Amino acid sequence: MTEEKINPMQKVKIEKVVLNVGAIGDELDKGFRLLKLLSNGKPAKMKSKKRIPTLNVRPGLEVGAVVTLRKNFPELLKKLLIAENNTFRKKQVSENNFSFGIKEYIEIPGMEYQRDIGIMGLDVTVVFKRTGRRVGLRKIKRGKVSKRQRVSPSEIIKFMEENFQTKFIGK
């Protein structure tokens, strides 16, 4: 009958959900519209920093769109997880984050085919944190945050299984 008390500073939380589409030219505009439609947020276009001659990428060229959701994301996250059947590989989980890709946005429940967008996929990254992370990130009076405050892959898997009923397979 005695419940194990958890230190409130050790609780795992979701910090943000990042949706990303990588494309160039017209595909980038379609990806931009897709992210706007999915998230009801304002996507930002990403510019390349390095030259990659084999891909015809030069510095300053817009190569993708990204939107970060910090509030009101649990409903969208549940839909995105359902699109992948709530089953993931353990390799997709790393320290402090969990990433997966969706091949076609029409797999997401509630999303219908948009003729002006066509068929597109997107990448989803879920970033985790513990309370007190801001101490290491702030600009004034920055402090050190110990390694214990990082969220391990096993803790992420446990959190996702308890709160979102996901299954992780593999080693």
Q: Which functions belong to the PLM regions below?
A:
Residues 1-171:
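Ribosome-associated RNA-binding proteins
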